[in-house]
Amino acid sequence: MGRFIFLSFGLLVVFLSLSGTGADCPSGWSSYEGHCYNIFHLFKTWAEAERFCRKQVKGAHLVSIESSEEADFVAQLVSENMKRYGIYIWIGLRVRGKKKQCSSQWSDGSSVSYQNWIEAESKTCLGLQKETEFRKWFNIYCGERNPFVCEA
């Protein structure tokens, strides 16, 4: 009887410890701070990638990076999974308007509170650059086709 109680308690502890991890993410997606992330090795324009993300999971968009900790998580995830693909990865931020100002919102509607530019240029979409280990934001022509990260 004592062994049964010990085993039951052990299973309960394991279940409770897993309930706050990736259990809520779809299969193949990675979990971080209550959000789910997936890298797609498909080469799409920024707009195509955003549309693709929206079709994957309810509430999904191109990734919005809102802290240095999240930037580190995304960089590690991309580095581990993009060893032989392109040099840029789309993120959910683009420049809008006649003055080419950076939008104050990510494609998911959240405010831009963290920035990590490598340099500012006249190109209107943003991605992570391989040369910076996918940690810095780089301006890229929106019609270029690149892999991307979706976040839900």
Curated annotation (Swiss-Prot):
- The residues covered by the C-type lectin domain are 32-151
Q: In which tissues is it expressed?
A: Expressed by the venom gland.
Give the range the annotation lists for the signal sequence. 1-23
GO MF, one annotated term: toxin activity
Q: Name one Pfam family in it.
A: Lectin_C
| Family note | Belongs to the snaclec family.
The task this protein performs is described as: Anticoagulant protein which binds to the gamma-carboxyglutamic acid-domain regions of factors IX (F9) and factor X (F10) in the presence of calcium with a 1 to 1 stoichiometry.
- Extra info from the record? Calcium is required for ligand binding.
Q: What is this protein called?
A: Snaclec coagulation factor IX/factor X-binding protein subunit A
What is the species of this protein? Gloydius halys
The organism's lineage? Eukaryota, Metazoa, Chordata, Craniata, Vertebrata
